[in-house]
């Protein structure tokens, strides 16, 4: 049965959802369309029973953009799509983060969601359509799922909110935020803004949620028509006696540990010791009270001596203890108040050869951030279905295993690192100078050296400081903070600057960055249902206060951007030449421009309009390259004196001298010296440099060629001219 339904979200944004035609062997498949952009989402969940010791949900979300969707060919030798691009990874993360909390507890079957863009009108982005399609594919399947989820993008143009703005509308929008949610709550946020207020942010979320409710209702309607029975699954039931035994053995010890402020490593060591002891004590307890026959015949009894199950029960006690400590006593693991930011230390310029650097430490989270300034040639190429451009401002985030005291392999960058780097980049991008203000390509690299929560926000702070240290004229400094939430029933507590444990054991991770005047980026993930707008408003206001506190600490370290670039940063000089001179500067096969680069050490970039940018770390190299280019493009002027090179000698006629690049003139034998010259080779040698004066320019009526008459004698008689035409 093919079902096709359409919904109008207003403002001409019409979305259609179809199921039952494509990919019918998947557990669920849906095609979503807006304009001529179409995505197909499929979901398959294994029916194979998970291993007994598995304690996680193996959900894999993949998002792929086919070049054929936009009538394009992939690059490379094989001309086919390969590993996912950064855009595809970020889109997959948007979908994964919104869907994952909505699967029922205890559902541990391997599940794979694949979202493929099959048509692109290159105007409507497919990422939020992919989130809608993925949720609807699950809804029409037999996979257990709590509630439909929808994603929308919200923009604001001239003060009016727009749902799912296209790329042309986003150019004029002062915010770009992706919102994922169910009919009752918001579960995911991510976006960038041009310094909007907390109230405006809340209004944007409410506007987006109204559209989400409509899309969720449509999904429920489609699922009801498909009417596929939900497959049965039985989550592992933990025996009450095991739960109680573990609680009695560990609750007091874990509570004492929770109320003792400790560093991350000390807490981890002591917690691990408690886990080890309690697991052994629990197994000994049940082995002493039950027979071996009971363990082999009663699955519930077997769970009581399973180390993985016992470990999970200890974790539940630890989580409950920490949450009640925060809710009942307003006390945190490190002893801080709920809205208190950890101590901050800042060092600037600690990497001598970098073009700007900062070491930002907040508690036990530390980021070493450097900037590198380059030319257009250093821009990052971006090629996807909706755009092909060069990024001149980008941030790379690295999270090596040693920053959390672990070993691990170093290789390709993971999805988490790409996501964190993208958030930090979007946070700072809003205050970066325009190309007209600062023609450099800017690369920021954040290396996390220590991590105990909020390393992406440390990258925002460190990135801002490194830019200011490097003399990059940013509009305003930006800081970031990660907020957390503990919620039990009607009671809740919002936490500022969360630790890793508070993130892991809490209900929300809400990162907010911005200037003193407003928010520039945000990212939120929610693990619970029922987040109301009052809590969100509280979190935004508390984040604002924390952000301003951090900005105050940053401004103490560096009140304003340095007035000069770093010593080793390239110095850029621009010159504009006639377009018809570009070929002369490049030379045959790039020979001329390559020789200039080799001789001067300068990097040269030429635009199609004749703008030439020279980048060099020394003023000498810059001046030498500039002089060479001026000489290459100079027009011969009668009366100017040049330094030329003898190219050919005709003893009875004179000498041919190259006085400008690729431009020769004749020094007649009578113009070589004031004295009589009978043989030119007695006075000049091939390759010799001589000072000549251009005395006449004539066009040969027979050949049409321009002929230049030079004089060494006249140049010697004239005083040396210090002007731009003279080749010194």
Swiss-Prot record:
What's the Enzyme Commission number for this chain? 2.7.7.8
Chain coiled-coil ranges = none
Localization recorded for this chain is: Cytoplasm
Question: For the KH domain, which residue ranges apply?
Answer: 570-629
**InterPro entries named among the record's database cross-references:** ExoRNase_PH_dom1, ExoRNase_PH_dom2, ExoRNase_PH_dom2_sf, KH_dom, KH_dom_type_1, KH_dom_type_1_sf, NA-bd_OB-fold, PNPase
Keyword list (alphabetical) reads: Cytoplasm, Magnesium, Metal-binding, Nucleotidyltransferase, RNA-binding, Transferase
Residues that bind Mg(2+), according to the entry? 503, 509
- Residue span, S1 motif domain: 639-713
User: What Pfam families does its record include?
Assistant: KH_1 (PF00013), PNPase (PF03726), RNase_PH (PF01138), RNase_PH_C (PF03725), S1 (PF00575)
Q: What GO biological process terms are annotated to this protein in UniProt?
A: mRNA catabolic process; RNA processing
Taking the first listed entry, what is the main subcellular location of this protein, grouped into a coarse class? cytoplasm
Instruction: List, in alphabetical order, the Gene Ontology terms for molecular function in this entry.
Output: 3'-5'-RNA exonuclease activity; magnesium ion binding; polyribonucleotide nucleotidyltransferase activity; RNA binding
What cellular-component terms does GO give this entry? cytosol
Give the reactions, separated by semicolons, that this protein catalyses: RNA(n+1) + phosphate = RNA(n) + a ribonucleoside 5'-diphosphate
Q: Which family does it belong to?
A: Belongs to the polyribonucleotide nucleotidyltransferase family.
Question: What's the stated role of this polypeptide?
Answer: Involved in mRNA degradation. Catalyzes the phosphorolysis of single-stranded polyribonucleotides processively in the 3'- to 5'-direction.
NCBIfam families in the record: polynuc_phos, PRK11824.1
Q: What is this protein called?
A: Polyribonucleotide nucleotidyltransferase
Q: Which organism is it from?
A: Pelodictyon phaeoclathratiforme (strain DSM 5477 / BU-1)
């Amino acid at each position: 049965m093919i079902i096709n339904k359409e919904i109008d979200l207003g403002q001409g944004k019409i979305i259609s959802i179809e199921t039952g035609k494509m990919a019918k062997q998947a557990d669920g498949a849906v095609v979503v369309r807006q304009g001529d952009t179409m995505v197909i989402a499929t979901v398959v969940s294994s029916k194979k029973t998970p291993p007994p010791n598995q304690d996680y949900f193996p959900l894999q979300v993949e998002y792929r953009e086919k070049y054929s969707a936009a009538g394009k060919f992939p690059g490379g030798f094989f001309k086919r799509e390969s590993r996912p691009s950064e855009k595809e990874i970020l889109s997959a993360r948007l979908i994964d983060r919104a869907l994952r909390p909505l699967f029922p507890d205890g559902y541990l079957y391997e599940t794979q969601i694949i979202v493929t863009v099959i048509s692109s009108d290159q105007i409507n982005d497919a990422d939020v359509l992919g989130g809608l399609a993925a949720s609807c594919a699950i809804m029409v399947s037999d996979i257990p799922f709590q509630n439909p989820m929808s994603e929308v993008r919200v923009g604001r143009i001239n003060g009016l909110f727009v749902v799912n703005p296209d790329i042309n509308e986003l150019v004029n929008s002062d915010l770009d935020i992706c919102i994922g949610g169910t009919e009752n709550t918001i579960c995911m946020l991510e976006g960038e803004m041009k310094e909007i207020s907390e109230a405006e942010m809340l209004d944007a979320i409410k506007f987006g949620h109204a559209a989400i409710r409509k899309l969720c209702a449509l999904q429920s309607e489609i699922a009801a028509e498909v009417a596929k029975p939900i497959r049965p699954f039985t989550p592992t039931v933990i025996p009450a006696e095991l739960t109680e035994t573990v609680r009695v053995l560990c609750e007091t010890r874990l509570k004492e540990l929770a109320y003792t402020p400790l560093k991350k490593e000390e807490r981890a060591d002591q917690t691990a010791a408690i886990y080890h002891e309690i697991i052994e004590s629990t197994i000994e307890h049940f082995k002493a009270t039950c027979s071996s026959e009971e363990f082999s015949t009663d699955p519930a009894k077997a769970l009581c001596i399973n180390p993985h199950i016992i470990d999970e029960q200890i974790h539940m006690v630890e989580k409950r203890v920490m949450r009640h400590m925060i809710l009942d006593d307003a006390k945190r693991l490190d002893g801080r108040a709920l809205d208190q930011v950890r101590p901050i230390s800042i060092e600037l310029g600690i990497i001598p050869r970098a073009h700007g650097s900062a070491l930002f430490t907040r508690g036990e989270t530390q980021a070493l951030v450097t900037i590198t300034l380059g030319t257009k040639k250093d821009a990052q190429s971006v090629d996807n279905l909706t755009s092909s451009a060069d990024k001149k401002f980008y941030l790379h985030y690295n999270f090596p295993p040693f920053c959390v005291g672990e070993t691990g392999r170093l290789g390709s960058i993971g999805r988490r690192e790409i996501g964190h780097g993208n958030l930090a980049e979007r946070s700072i991008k809003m205050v970066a100078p325009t190309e007209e203000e600062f023609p450099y390509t800017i690369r920021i690299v954040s290396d996390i050296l220590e991590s105990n929560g909020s390393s992406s926000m440390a990258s925002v702070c460190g990135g801002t400081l490194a830019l200011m240290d490097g003399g990059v004229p940013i509009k305003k400094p930006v800081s970031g903070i990660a907020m957390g939430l503990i919620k039990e029933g009607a009671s809740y507590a919002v936490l500022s600057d969360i630790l890793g444990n508070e993130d892991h054991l809490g209900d929300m991770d809400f990162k907010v960055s911005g200037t003193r005047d407003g928010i520039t980026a945000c990212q939120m993930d929610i693990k619970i249902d029922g987040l109301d707008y009052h809590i969100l408003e509280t979190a935004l206001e508390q984040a604002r206060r924390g952000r301003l506190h951090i900005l105050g600490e940053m401004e103490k370290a560096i009140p304003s951007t340095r007035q000069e670039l770093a010593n080793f940063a390239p110095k850029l000089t621009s010159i504009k030449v006639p377009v018809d001179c570009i070929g002369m500067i490049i030379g045959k096969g790039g020979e001329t421009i390559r020789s200039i680069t080799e001789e001067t050490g300068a990097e040269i970039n030429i635009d199609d309009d004749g703008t030439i940018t020279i980048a060099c770390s020394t003023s000498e190299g810059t001046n030498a390259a500039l002089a060479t280019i001026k000489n290459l493009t100079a027009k011969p002027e009668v009366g100017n004196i040049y330094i030329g090179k003898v190219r050919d000698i005709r003893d009875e006629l004179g000498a041919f001298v190259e006085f400008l690049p690729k431009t020769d003139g004749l020094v007649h034998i009578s113009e070589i010296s004031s004295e009589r010259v009978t043989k030119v080779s007695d006075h000049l040698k091939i390759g010799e440099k001589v000072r000549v004066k251009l005395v006449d320019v004539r066009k040969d009526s027979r050949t049409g060629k321009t002929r230049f008459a030079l004089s060494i004698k006249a140049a010697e008689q004239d005083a040396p001219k210090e002007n731009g035409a003279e080749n010194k």
